[in-house]
Amino acid sequence: MAQASMDLGILQETKCTDGIHTRALAGYSVVATDMPIRHRDGVAVYYRSSPNFAVEAVRQFGPNVVDFQLATGARRWYIIGCYLASDDTSTIESVVAAIKDQPQGAALLVAGDLNTTLTEPENDQRGTDIAAALTAEGLADMATHFLPRRRTWRTCSMVREGKVVRSRTDYILGTDCRLF
């Protein structure tokens, strides 16, 4: 992280159990969720102090959800990091609860691995429920507002039971693309 000059990030599938993880190293602070099942899921946020921003109120909001506030000059962001496993149907409820806990005056961002394609849910109830829940909260994919000249992200694609299944798993969702 330091070699890449990254001051802040959200990690997914951290697989931390029993509260065992690095909490501080090389100037970084790390807050990770504690998973009840070993070697499965989890998210973490890492950050170091910067003159350009301050990270405040980092907390765990369920086993696969962390949230924090990011103050950058006159603007304040409420950021939710999440990981929704492909067989998980309950974490979206924690994400929605965290969204409803948004502080007044803070712009909302949700960053995470949703294991579904929001624009084309895979004809399964899970994908449809996730897309509906996030759309109901007024969230939209920020990547569609910043189209590159060429495709720069990868999607997973496979044939399962004679049907092509595609997924773009990582998203940054927000309520107002004009803030970027």
Predicted regions and their residues:
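A shared catalytic/ligand-binding motif for oxyanion handling
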Residues: 1-180
